[in-house]
Amino acid sequence: MNISFVCVEDGITALGFRKMVSLVKSIHPSTEACYIPLTNQYNPLRFLLKPGEHDRIYSDADLNSIASHLAKSDLVCFSSMTAYSDLTKEIIQLVKKTNPKTYIIWGGIHPIVHPEDAIEYPDAICTGEGETSFKLFLSSFKKGEDYTSTKNFWFNNNGKIIKNDFLPLHTSEEMEKFPFMSYAEDYELIYKQDKGFVPTTTNDYLSSFGLGNTYDTIWSIGCPYKCTYCANNKFIENDKDYRKLRHPSVDYVIAEVKEVL
């Protein structure tokens, strides 16, 4: 069984996405990561120089090429924010049209904040932290067992929506066991116009991060604040314990940096 994880957003930083890909790759080796950046320039400084620019750059031919590649997988898992949800919906529909047997999951910020909107398009959405819940889903999915009771997931079963409750948030001890994020691996692909999905290169990373030869990571999860512009409001609404900071040990993050070096 082949799995494609797909990130639809500006650039290829995608820290949460990278964490998920590393974890899934560790339990299911036949997994690839596909990045679909939405602008020609991935540099985050663009947001200072050209604020509000999120124009889609892909032609219908590009979208069909993207869908054709993804439709070869048995399981396709999208991740996107709300700003890129319309494009994600369009790609999901094209993948389904190309291969109706491909099972599609949508995770990331948009399905968490707007689950009622997101569930209309894929077979399932992830509405909370994905590491443990996806492992539970995948175990049942691969065995041919019923997976529709998996917590942190909603399912669209031919128009019948199944809404499951949330799992407890990951503890610091559980986070300690997660693999490090994936960078520059041979299973990472980036979509480029007129070329299709090609392996990521050093230049792709440097232009994406925009600040030279840097390494981005994230150590802690959780926040006590409710800023109006942030999705943290929804996280706290779903589980009040999201206000608490959680993180693996200092040794964990030191080991992560050493591995990169």
Place the predicted regions along the sequence by residue.
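Generic structural signal for well-ordered alpha-helices
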Residues: 21, 66, 88-92, 215, ...
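Conserved SAM/AdoMet-binding glycine-rich loop
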Residues: 1-10, 32, 75, 105, ...
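A short, glycine/small-residue-rich beta-strand->loop->alpha-helix junction that serves as a flexible
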Residues: 8-16, 80-85, 213
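A short, Lys/Arg-enriched amphipathic alpha-helix followed by its capping loop at the start of a domain
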Residues: 20-31
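Radical SAM [4Fe-4S] cluster-binding motif and immediate context
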Residues: 173, 183-261
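N-terminal pre-core extensions flanking Radical SAM catalytic domains
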Residues: 47-53, 226-230
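Glycine-rich beta-alpha loop elements in corrinoid/cobalamin-binding modules
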Residues: 32, 38-40, 55-172
